[in-house]
């Protein structure tokens, strides 16, 4: 795999047929395409994560299973701002719609300028081949002072990698996060089936009388 540089990114965004095109839209300024990455802007929709009275949330917790609402949707117009206080966590999204063709994979990184102020943009990092939508950004202020962030700010950067060949298994239509149009809350509860399988494997291993394997 190799990362696409400036000219290759531009060619990828004009590629024909359209199914093989890298889509990052709207691109408000051509200068967002850097030497080996594309700067992404912060969108207008946010989900503020509320604290719960109970202590934990997880795939098998009551909140996860019952789908209890614990996030508030906030809409900020382009050029408007949101205060992110120390220790606060919100879900945001990119302004740009992204579509990754089957022969490319994306990596999303926070920008150093924001990190030096205490803003962590802990995205899911990897964009699978075949994925499309606006990207959810997990924004957290780990600094000591409130941060004023604006809808439309350059918030992250997209690095695009060329696969050795087109994948036969692109991001599936039945996957958890398909074509989102705004910040999406966690769907960890959909992984409970995997937890049940792990429990059964553990029970079978204990049934053989030996200790669980160590790595």
What is each PLM-predicted segment?
Residues 1-215:
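DUTPase catalytic domain/fold
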């Amino acid at each position: 795999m190799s990362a696409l540089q400036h000219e290759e990114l531009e060619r990828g965004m004009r590629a024909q047929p359209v199914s093989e095109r890298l889509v990052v839209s709207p691109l408000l300024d051509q200068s967002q395409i850097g030497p080996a990455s594309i700067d992404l802007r912060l969108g207008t929709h946010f989900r503020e994560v509320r604290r719960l009275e109970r202590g934990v949330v997880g795939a098998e917790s009551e909140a996860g299973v019952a789908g209890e609402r614990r996030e508030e949707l906030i809409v900020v117009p382009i050029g408007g701002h949101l205060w992110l206080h120390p220790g606060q966590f919100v879900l945001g999204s990119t302004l740009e719609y992204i579509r990754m063709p089957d022969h490319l994979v994306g990596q999303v990184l926070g920008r150093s300028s924001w990190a030096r102020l205490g803003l962590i943009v802990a995205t899911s990092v990897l964009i699978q081949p075949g994925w499309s939508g606006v990207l959810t950004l997990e924004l957290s202020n780990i600094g000591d002072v409130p941060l004023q962030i604006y809808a439309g700010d350059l918030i992250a950067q997209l690095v695009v990698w060329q696969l050795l060949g087109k994948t036969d298994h692109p991001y599936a239509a039945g996957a958890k996060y398909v074509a989102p149009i705004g910040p999406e809350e966690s769907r960890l509860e959909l992984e409970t089936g995997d937890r049940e399988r792990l429990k059964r494997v553990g029970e079978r291993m204990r049934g053989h009388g030996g200790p669980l394997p160590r790595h």
